[in-house]
């Protein structure tokens, strides 16, 4: 097996484990709110993720400049180490579970470490994956994002595997060991900084990149709505709890399947037209969900909404990388931050509109139409066919 192939395997495995590590705190929600363990209130558990969102945004915006100065290997290693410190500390915390007065403050610090580490890691991983496939940048980013998403969906399953919530410490323990092993392998790789990660000495952010930024903030609002509010929407439309949870799983399954297929098939066919019409398709599906919420097709609708949303975010990073090759790492950080801004904003305001589902769906339709209009505007004179 040649060196490049080993590098690709390690990078993509690290992306998967970064996704697993990232959702460890929400995955342990039952342990955190268990009165016999961490005994956090519902509001404390919700507030736990505020520093995470803030730290992700800051680190995503800072990462391009840090990578430009010290190179991708150092920054990615630092990001993974921050997440490992958080996960390892959480693992050790089971020895001090009786000190309940300090637990919330300690968890806030750990979550901040996880957010900072994730922002640095994922912002660096996107262009690093793209640099390994110079003629297939977008495909590489789509597949990498598929693996990150697969990781985020795997971590909650670990709680089901361990059974009793009192065995929660085995989740951070197993993740810590797995990530440490892959990080050790990564440290032995030779990762060149290369021109792919260099920023010009003087630059101005293009107006087109600002448009990408706005589009992804809006996308983040929609993704965040389904991520934190999808179950409530489905129950409002007539599904019971089990069916609503299944619908949410199908939504994320659709997202993951699209990213995998898009990453594979775009190597053979030009999928730029599919990418451009995807926001319109989501808008149409949301409109049907609003005016004709047939309980028999709701689960299919959730899968299709997720499927057509799947390529929008990573595809935008890939497209932006092709449009602005001199700013590839900046594109990654800029759009990762935009996604978190949208997701974080909508997550914190949706609770005030829980009784206005039709209004929420109407806003989502409008946002998708705006995203579609922005993409068609960006298409003019662009290199989108080279991206997909």
Language-model features and meaning:
Residues 324-357:
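A late C-terminal transmembrane helix in Major Facilitator Superfamily
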Residues 101-120, 297-311:
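Hydrophobic core of transmembrane alpha-helices in multi-pass small-molecule transporters
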Residues 25-26, 207-257:
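Extracytoplasmic gate region of multi-pass secondary transporters
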Residues 81-100, 281-293:
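C-terminal ends and interior cores of transmembrane alpha-helices
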Residues 59-72, 163, 259-270, 354:
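Helix-to-loop junctions at the C-terminal end of transmembrane segments
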Residues 110-146:
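Cytoplasmic helix-loop-helix junction between adjacent transmembrane helices
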Residues 135-136, 143-191:
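Helix-loop-helix hairpin linking two adjacent transmembrane segments in secondary transporters
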Residues 269-316:
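C-terminal transmembrane helical hairpin of 12-TM major facilitator-type secondary transporters
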């Amino acid at each position: 097996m040649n060196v490049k192939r080993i590098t690709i395997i390690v990078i993509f495995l690290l992306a998967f484990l970064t996704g697993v590590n990232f959702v460890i705190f929400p995955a342990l929600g039952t342990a955190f709110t268990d009165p016999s363990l961490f005994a956090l209130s519902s509001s404390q558990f919700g507030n736990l993720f505020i520093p995470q969102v803030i730290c992700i945004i800051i680190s995503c915006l800072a990462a391009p400049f840090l990578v430009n100065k010290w190179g991708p290997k150092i920054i990615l290693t630092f990001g993974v180490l921050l997440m490992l410190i958080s996960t390892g500390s959480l693992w050790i915390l089971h020895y001090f579970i009786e000190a309940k007065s300090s637990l919330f403050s300690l968890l806030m610090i750990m979550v901040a470490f996880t957010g900072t580490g994730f922002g640095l890691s994922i912002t660096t991983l996107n262009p690093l994956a793209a640099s390994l496939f110079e003629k297939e940048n977008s495909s590489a980013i789509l597949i990498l994002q598929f693996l990150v998403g697969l990781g985020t969906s795997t971590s909650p399953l670990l709680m089901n595997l361990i059974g009793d919530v009192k065995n929660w410490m085995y989740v951070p323990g197993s993740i810590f060991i797995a990530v440490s092993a892959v990080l050790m392998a990564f440290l032995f790789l030779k990762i060149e900084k290369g021109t792919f990660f260099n920023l010009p000495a003087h630059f101005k952010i293009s107006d087109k990149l600002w448009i990408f930024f706005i589009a992804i903030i809006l996308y983040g609002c929609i993704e965040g709505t389904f991520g934190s509010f999808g179950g409530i929407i489905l129950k409002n439309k007539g599904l019971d709890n089990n069916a609503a949870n299944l619908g949410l799983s199908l939504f994320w399954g659709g997202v993951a399947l699209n990213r995998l297929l898009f990453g594979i098939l775009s190597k053979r066919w030009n999928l730029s037209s599919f990418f451009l019409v995807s926001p319109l398709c989501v808008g149409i599906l949301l409109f049907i969900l609003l005016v004709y919420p047939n309980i028999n097709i709701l689960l299919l609708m959730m899968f299709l909404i997720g499927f057509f949303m799947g390529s929008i975010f990573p595809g935008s990073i890939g497209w932006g990388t092709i449009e602005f090759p001199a700013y590839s790492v900046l594109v990654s950080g800029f759009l990762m931050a935009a996604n978190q801004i949208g997701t974080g904003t909508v997550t914190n305001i949706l609770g005030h509109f829980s009784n206005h589902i039709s209004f929420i769906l109407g806003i989502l339709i409008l946002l998708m139409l705006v995203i579609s209009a922005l993409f068609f505007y960006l298409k003019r004179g662009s290199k989108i066919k080279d991206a997909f």
